[in-house]
Amino acid sequence: MHKAPIDPNSGIWDKYFVYPLAMTLDWFAEHLWGQYGLSILVVTLIIRSLILPLTMKQYRSSKRMQELQPEIRKLKEKYKNDAKKQQEETMKLFQQQGVNPLAGCFPLLIQMPVLIALYNAIMRNQMISEHTFLWMQLGSPDPYYILPLLAAATTFLQQKVMSTQVNAQMKNLMYIFPVLIFVMAMNFASALPLYWVYSNAFTVVQSYFIYGGSRNKGVQKLEKSGGNR
């Protein structure tokens, strides 16, 4: 995989983030018939489940901001010739409604180090790079392009399920991201696109309950199971 080996003594990042995740992957593989492909699945599900409360918090913040959009548009129209007054009144509205416009960013910022650490734990684990799962060598690109296709397809599904929550410009990206994922997955060691497939599939199911047809019921179920922990 051409990555530096994981050394718990090399710094805080490896010691407290990457190394524990790598050891967790090894432990699950040992208890799952030596299958690192299954270990990556289990660890991905655990991490995504643990950050589910953050995802729900991000959703609630986004939903509240959407509910305020009519009022925000009125303020923009009313003070279209006075940018300073428009900003002041908008912030006043946020304060009155108890909304922090940056609140939706905080969960994402917290999630990113964990997900990057998981990426490093997978890509820098020599045991994973030498392991074979199903038809693929986890340390080498998929020669049959099955995994890149699955990664691209699940990325598209993820974007499709969440498309109702983004603007028209962002919707155009739902056709670009899968292509980029396919190209990258063609050249990356199979362990990484395998993680993408698992993570995307989790997001598709999660997003269906959050954003899908049974929106309110799904949110209530998720909040009861994980959103308020």
Give the positions of each predicted feature.
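Helix-loop-helix
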Residues: 1-229
